[in-house]
Curated annotation (Swiss-Prot):
The record marks 37, 41, 44 as: May interact with the LDL receptor. This is Apolipoprotein C-III. Belongs to the apolipoprotein C3 family. It is found in: Secreted. The gene is APOC3. Glycans are attached at residue 94.
Length: 99
């Protein structure tokens, strides 16, 4: 073989090797980017789940406090007006007797 042909073949082999290395680097880079996107999404999902749980606990507390206040208010109203509701069976309003 002529030296020029050998030189061209060697340069082509070197160029092909460099391209293959770039393809591997690009594929590794895209793999790592995909992995980081997945890890970021997982972390965000976990954080939002914890925050939703805390919000749900706070909302349950508010609802419980609201029902407790309503129950206390109803008890107070019931006690104040119980004298009107508890009529003595012996004391009945008199009705006019027609003669």
């Amino acid at each position: 073989m002529q030296p020029r042909v050998l030189l061209v073949v060697a340069l082509l082999a070197l160029l092909a090797s460099a391209r293959a290395s770039e393809a591997e680097d690009a594929s590794l880079l895209s793999f790592m980017q995909g992995y980081m996107k997945h890890a970021t999404k997982t972390a965000k999902d976990a954080l939002s789940s914890v925050q939703e749980s805390q919000v749900a606990q706070q909302a349950r507390g508010w609802v419980t406090d609201g029902f407790s206040s309503l129950k206390d208010y109803w008890s107070t109203v019931k006690d104040k007006f119980s004298e009107f509701w508890d009529l003595d069976p012996e004391v009945r309003p008199t009705s006019a007797v027609a003669a």
